[in-house]
């Protein structure tokens, strides 16, 4: 099913599966998602994977996650899968808070009765998308509908001194917070730091980092784990030695998949 305009289909037969591409969840051209609806779904038990692409808050596309979208469909045929595009940051319009609002708006869309989906979500994000997944799951999900998060190389604490002293720090973070430095507004930087927003109710989290990532200091993993542990949140974290920004070696790529599947099977099957 192709959806180009605001979605006007009134019902999707729950006895059939659907893959809807470019489903609009808002009026902006970037407020689009791909959505897989499994056969025999219902609003009590059909869980939803939500995929949030990376790209420094200002680039990237849901197409980056097409392989993951298709892989989840085949591995977990009873789950729905949403692959999200969101409004990208521009020089005059930073990612925060509009991208968090977009995640909420997309979730509001799939909560409509016509989709027959439960309010149980597992978020997958890479890089900036992992940051958004964690920030939404930890700070913007008061009803605790997010049950788990897979964080791949996501920034977690933007107040980290390793980050503040990082040569490309301000250039990248401008996509998220606009033309504001840490020293100008430390409260904003804490507000958008997932590790600072962890509570005892935060969703279970599995994280992956590379030890020689040029964009993410290794302290980002330990600061997140410290916050999760302090709040008693179940989590797993893996640092791949010698690997960079999510481009794993073949054996680590295999390990990555095994660990993710095992985590989902444990908590979100």
Regions found by a protein language model. Name each.
Residues 2-269:
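Alpha/beta-hydrolase superfamily serine-hydrolase fold, recognizing
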